[in-house]
């Protein structure tokens, strides 16, 4: 079994300091949280950025400030900007961090109803366009899937040459409007991807650590962080993203699965630094 890649989604676009006062907004806070996760064992930093007041932004300039500062604090980390941004952003806004030529970026592979009137729109043409710019800028996509139909979309587009292979998937589980976070559903998703593909599991809230354990024992990789869950255990806010990563490292040790370094993660993901 491959070594375990741990991704830290350190702030997201929706979670706020009201949910957990340690959620980072400023560049300094974002770097602090990235370093806490990196030092704990995360090799990938999944990155959203905020204005100082917490407003989500896809500003290329703001991303550059954060990326440069994270690289200085965590020189070997794989920084993976989000192209999901926040609900309601334009395609042009969402694409901005791709033009910084990061090693990886997220590629959302379908539309999802997030609840109420919130629709996270990702049409087929949008996915093709985003992937085109990733290929042009040498960016490895992480195919974000919220249900099985999005895997089918990614496979279909890959067969047409729109998405490079082998693909790496992120199974986003337990989101309103998406697939549930259960062992049965994870096994179903794993059986739906091409055999040469790799996958990470991102489960929301209380599901984060049970599904992390499932990912570890099924040969997948794990994402944790404030974007997906702000608690270290029931009713106890996490002190940092690093604390969440440390818990995954302990789980991996119990199951006898070594944690990948950033250089080992690059080899697994097929990324050339």
From Swiss-Prot:
Keywords: Metal-binding, Transferase, Zinc
MF annotations from Gene Ontology: 3-keto-5-aminohexanoate cleavage activity; metal ion binding
Binding residue positions for Zn(2+): 46, 48, 227
Keyword Aminoacyl-tRNA synthetase attributed: no
InterPro entries, A to Z: Aldolase_TIM (IPR013785), BKACE (IPR008567)
A Gene Ontology biological process term: L-lysine catabolic process to acetate
Pathway listed: Amino-acid degradation; L-lysine degradation via acetate pathway
EC top class named in words: transferase
EC number, UniProt record: 2.3.1.247
Cofactor: Zn(2+)
Binding site for (5S)-5-amino-3-oxohexanoate: 14, 82, 85, 106
Catalysed reaction equations from the record: (5S)-5-amino-3-oxohexanoate + acetyl-CoA = (3S)-3-aminobutanoyl-CoA + acetoacetate
Family in the record: Belongs to the BKACE family. Kce subfamily.
PANTHER family listed in its UniProt record: 3-KETO-5-AMINOHEXANOATE CLEAVAGE ENZYME (PTHR37418:SF2), 3-KETO-5-AMINOHEXANOATE CLEAVAGE ENZYME-RELATED (PTHR37418)
Role: Involved in the anaerobic fermentation of lysine. Catalyzes the reversible reaction between 3-keto-5-aminohexanoate (KAH) and acetyl-CoA to form 3-aminobutyryl-CoA and acetoacetate. The reaction involves the deprotonation of KAH, the nucleophilic addition onto acetyl-CoA and the intramolecular transfer of the CoA moiety.
Oligomeric form and interacting partners: Homotetramer.
Protein name: 3-keto-5-aminohexanoate cleavage enzyme
UniProt organism field: Acetoanaerobium sticklandii (strain ATCC 12662 / DSM 519 / JCM 1433 / CCUG 9281 / NCIMB 10654 / HF) (Clostridium sticklandii)
Organism classification: Bacteria, Bacillati, Bacillota, Clostridia, Peptostreptococcales
